[in-house]
Amino acid sequence: MCVGKKIKSYLESNGITQTFVANRTGIPVQKLNLSLNGNRRLDFDEYELICGALSVGTDKFLEPKIPEQKGV
């Protein structure tokens, strides 16, 4: 699942509106909506703003990248 959709799911689970996030971050609602629906990539700066508005760490919606083990 992409980061935007994870954020959208988090918002829905916690009763937080996209308008609230847009107002707290300064990201236009239309732009935010496109990102949360997977139709636009989030910039890292926007991602940081969203995490700050939600009071969560920037690792909240990211999947850990597991390095490939060579020779195993």
Question: Model segments located where?
Answer:
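Recognition helix of helix-turn-helix/homeodomain-like DNA-binding domains
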Residues: 27-41
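Short alpha-helical "recognition helix" segments of helix-turn-helix
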Residues: 21-22, 50
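A short, Lys/Arg-rich alpha-helix, primarily the initiator
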Residues: 1-17
